Design a protein with these regions (language model features):
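Glycine/proline-enriched, intrinsically flexible loops and inter-domain linkers
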Residues: 1-87, 92-269, 273-396
């Protein structure tokens, strides 16, 4: 697996599996602790561990098409907080346009991990929350024309500062949702998962001491090398495909998602030139999820036990033109971005089908079906108490 001097391949495998087990344990904590069905039952959430440079080193076995979103967000975390981070801090974000988020219900909670006073890594979680405000229960209205109609935008902020919770931010979140008990409960499940990730990574770093980062770096190198080796086995060439989703509005025209997959040596370029401009509806897909769908597609068609870390993403280059449905710009609505995100995956499968027909997935239903409903029930003294729920049906 590794040919680097000073790196013991058995220890490398132990480190890799320890990291993966910790990321999976984080995922189980969320599943067991979450309040809302969309997290607890649908498992619409993700977990990851990152090294001190913010690179993903392990991912929980949760929602595959979302796992590749962490690198986009972590770049913003490093830019904003890498110098000022301190023990006990926890960050929160959901903004697609300010910090690499996806759509507003997907809230990220990130905890920097310190060992002996030094920043050594991060525990990262994302969960689809049942409601963050906006014009429709569940915060996903396909007829929304701009993001300001979809709910609360959370810029990258401190949810916990040096171990002290930001009560103002907790109250702000509770005041902008129809489901405060579910949202705050799921948020605390994410906090608990981050603490589990912190414990697991700390134990690993203390066990191996200064050599630990040698092995974390080597995992990235091995993943990149193995991905390049797999891509090099494929013949050079360009493969194109265009898929469509139904349009929206009174006189809808089909919305094309055009993809060109170019394999050159040990790299691949995925180009979305020709894809529809962004639309005045909530199906626009922020680029973070588009990247994740691309990584997921390529990761799925290659062979070999490639470490599930950020290194395998390096040979995969992506060009998604700004202002399109695969890279919208403010103020485009994006609540139903999964419709495009999953179709991006399908389009890549369509492009690669003639090349590796035995490895691509057959086309699914083309995207997730999300059902959200809500209303009000009478409480004491005729108080109007909101209720609601969100369910996601995905067969892909």
């Amino acid at each position: 697996m590794s040919d680097r001097p000073g790196v013991d391949p058995i220890t490398l495998e132990v480190v890799k599996n320890a990291l993966a087990s910790t990321a999976d344990e984080m995922a189980l904590v969320i599943m067991r602790s979450a309040y809302s069905p969309v997290v607890r039952d649908t498992m619409d959430y993700s977990t990851a561990l990152c090294d001190r440079n913010g690179r993903v080193v392990a991912q929980g076995l949760t929602l595959a098409v979302q796992l590749g979103t962490f690198p986009t967000l972590m770049r913003y975390v490093l830019e904003e907080y890498s110098v000022s981070a301190k023990p006990g801090d926890v960050y929160i974000a959901n903004d697609p346009y300010g910090c690499g988020g996806q759509h507003l219900p997907d809230i990220y909670v990130i905890k920097p991990i310190f060992v002996a006073g030094e920043l050594e890594g991060y525990a990262a979680t994302m969960a689809h929350h049942s409601d963050v405000g906006g014009i429709a229960p569940g915060s996903i209205a396909v007829h929304a024309t701009e993001i300001y109609q979809e709910g609360l935008r959370i810029p990258l902020s401190k949810l916990v500062d040096g171990g002290v919770e930001n009560e103002t931010l907790f109250r702000l979140l509770a005041s902008n949702t129809r489901q405060p008990v579910h949202v705050l409960g799921d948020l605390r499940a994410q906090l608990a998962a981050c603490r589990v990730g912190e414990r697991g990574l700390t134990t690993l770093l203390e066990r191996y001491g200064p050599d630990a980062h040698l092995y974390l770096d080597e995992l990235q190198r091995v993943a990149e090398r193995m991905m390049r080796a797999e891509l090099a086995l494929l013949p050079d060439g360009v493969h194109a495909f265009t898929d469509y989703i139904d349009g929206v509005g009174d006189d809808p025209e089909p919305i094309p998602i055009s993809v060109r997959v170019e394999i050159s040596g040990d790299e691949v370029l995925i180009d979305f030139e020709g894809t529809s401009p962004q639309v005045e509806a909530s199906v626009n897909c922020p680029v973070g999820m588009v990247y994740a769908a691309c990584y997921c597609a390529i990761r799925g068609i290659v062979r070999g036990e490639i470490p599930n870390c950020e290194g395998y993403m390096v040979p995969i280059r992506i060009d998604a033109p700004a202002g399109t449905v695969v890279n919208p710009v403010l103020p485009a609505a994006c609540g139903a971005r999964g419709v495009i995100g999953y179709r991006v995956y399908d389009a890549i499968m369509g492009a690669l089908a003639p090349l590796v027909p035995d490895r691509v997935l057959a086309a699914g239903e083309g995207g997730p079906t999300l059902i959200a409903w809500g209303g009000y029930q009478r409480g004491y003294d005729d108080e109007r108490i909101p209720f609601g729920t969100t369910e996601v049906l995905v067969g892909t």
